[in-house]
Amino acid sequence: MSRLVLAIGNSRWHWGIFSRDQAPQFWDAIAPHQPFSRSDLATFLQAQDPAIVADTPIAIASVVPQQLALLPEDWPQRRLQLRDVPLTNCYPQLGLDRAIALYEAGCQAGWPVLMIDCGTAITINAGDAEGQFAGGAILPGVTLQLRSLAQGTAALPSVEISAEGDRWGMDNQSAIASGVIYGIAGALRGFIEDWRSHHPQRPIYFTGGDGELLAKLLTDLPDIRVEPHLLLHGIDRLAQAMMTDPD
């Protein structure tokens, strides 16, 4: 039987289908503007995989709690919370997505590990040798920085970035792209080098929509791993563990 997972982010819903018989499937969708009915949700899911049956339980992690109301109440759901993540030393306001993705990185690579999630906000998340949350940082993501320049200035244009360009921009668009991309990469390099001074030769995971783009600017650093769907893998891992050990 297929297993459905959903990560509700700030701007998109990230879906995954896991099963024993085939490789996982992943897709993203813009957050819906109105609630799903049961039939609408079934149609939406079966468009991705006709083998999905109605009422297949969905394991969910959300950083936007109010969007949970967009799912039909009578569709089976397992809504994960921070207390469900076996990661100790978490502060109460730690984002659920950060905790799950860091835990999954530790499960895949062992501890200590560093996980960098490059989404709307970029979060840097450290786990120590005992599998505890060891601190981190939050900074505006690529799109958020681009939007702030376009909205907060009179003369600078709106810019979209799909690939890294020349560091030395020859017009406003390329200068903005360079400043944002290389500025973020420089900040991440500083955190990585500091962490590696304490944990040499330990892996660093990049995930999130801009994870691959930013990781490409740091390929001189050893053992950089890009796992776009780290959070969805973590949700599935936790949901399966909760099914086998409901207490």
From Swiss-Prot:
Its main location: cytoplasm. Substrate binds at residues 91, 95-98. InterPro entries: ATPase_NBD (IPR043129), Type_III_PanK (IPR004619). GO terms for molecular function: ATP binding; metal ion binding; pantothenate kinase activity. A monovalent cation. Ammonium or potassium. It comes from the Bacteria. Catalyzes the phosphorylation of pantothenate (Pan), the first step in CoA biosynthesis. This is Type III pantothenate kinase. It comes from Synechococcus sp. (strain ATCC 27144 / PCC 6301 / SAUG 1402/1).
